[in-house]
From Swiss-Prot:
This is Homeobox protein Hox-D9a. CDD domains: homeodomain. The gene is hoxd9a. Residues 169-197 are annotated as: Disordered. PROSITE patterns: HOMEOBOX_1, HOMEOBOX_2. Belongs to the Abd-B homeobox family. It is found in: Nucleus. Residues 169-188 have a biased composition (Basic and acidic residues). Sequence-specific transcription factor which is part of a developmental regulatory system that provides cells with specific positional identities on the anterior-posterior axis. Keywords: Developmental protein, DNA-binding, Homeobox, Nucleus, Transcription, Transcription regulation. GO terms for molecular function: DNA-binding transcription factor activity, RNA polymerase II-specific; RNA polymerase II cis-regulatory region sequence-specific DNA binding. Residues 205-264 bind DNA.
Length: 273
């Protein structure tokens, strides 16, 4: 027994611990017979079974059957090969070495590969232990791809469409102050000592209260200088010539007389001072 342990310990500390835990106190002949029979128990893969077999037909045996079953019923490639799983390459990378020693020891806590053949286990090209882990990963990747390829919501599209309008509004608002500054400069250029020039070139910013044009105002001023009060016939003629109503002509003359009286009071006040 000690000679057998020293021989098995040359494959490494992991295989030595594994052999001590599994072998127990059985005789060397039993294990020799089992290890000799193992390479001849290679069962070819059924050609009728595809990679996309139905998972509903799989009936897993309890774990107690793994330890109590004979070593001859378990394919050595499924137990001793390193845990490197390839979906399309099974029969070349997991063969034991020529001197009878096995390259790696697989932990019993890991999922059993599809090479292990039990009575109630249906052989398939895929590993049932890794299948439940692959599906959630694929779902997560699909969700990530869908989130990246998902188009923008309607709120972002509307906000992007409103950007040009907002830019135009800001541009128009920036032009308004420059226009007002231009008006102020023109008003400053007017001569304060020449009221006639100020009246002709004046541009009030507030809404105009009368529809009179410059030509109409000039003709009314001429008529006022000639006669401060108009008769009904003369008022009718002036309204017809200037395309105004008699009421408009009457109101203009009333306002003009009030303005003249105000100017006269200011002049008289300056003379008394």
């Amino acid at each position: 027994m000690s000679r057998k342990r020293s021989k098995m310990s040359t494959s490494g500390p992991l295989s030595n611990c594994y052999v001590d835990a599994i072998m127990g106190q059985d005789s060397e002949d039993v294990y020799g017979a089992r290890y000799i029979q193992a390479p001849h128990m290679v069962t070819p893969r059924p050609s009728s079974v595809g990679d996309n077999a139905d998972f509903a037909s799989c009936n897993f045996a309890p774990k107690s059957a793994v330890f109590s079953s004979s070593w001859s019923s378990v394919h050595p490639q499924g137990i001793y090969h390193p845990y490197v799983h390839h979906h399309h390459h099974h029969h070349q990378s997991h063969l034991p070495s020529a001197d009878g020693r096995y390259v790696g020891v697989r932990s019993w806590m890991e999922p059993i590969s599809n090479h292990v053949s039990f009575a109630g286990l249906h052989t398939s090209g895929r590993s049932y232990g890794t299948k439940p882990e692959v599906l959630p990963l694929k779902d997560a990747e699909c969700d990530a791809l869908e989130a990246e390829s998902r188009p923008l919501s309607a709120g972002f599209v509307c906000a992007a469409a409103a950007c040009p309008d907002r830019a135009r509004k800001e541009h128009g608002a920036s032009e308004l102050p420059s226009h007002d500054e231009h008006k102020e400069e023109k008003q400053q250029q007017l001569d304060p000592n020449n009221p006639a020039a100020n009246w002709i070139h004046a541009r009030s910013t507030r809404k105009k209260r009368c529809p009179y044009t410059k030509y109409q105002t000039l003709e009314l001023e001429k008529e006022f200088l000639y006669n401060m009060y108009l008769t009904r016939d003369r008022r009718y003629e002036v309204a017809r010539i200037l395309s105004l109503t008699e009421r408009q002509v009457k109101i203009w003359f009333q306002n003009r007389r009030m303005k003249m009286k105000k100017q006269n009071r200011e002049r008289s006040g300056k003379e008394h001072i």
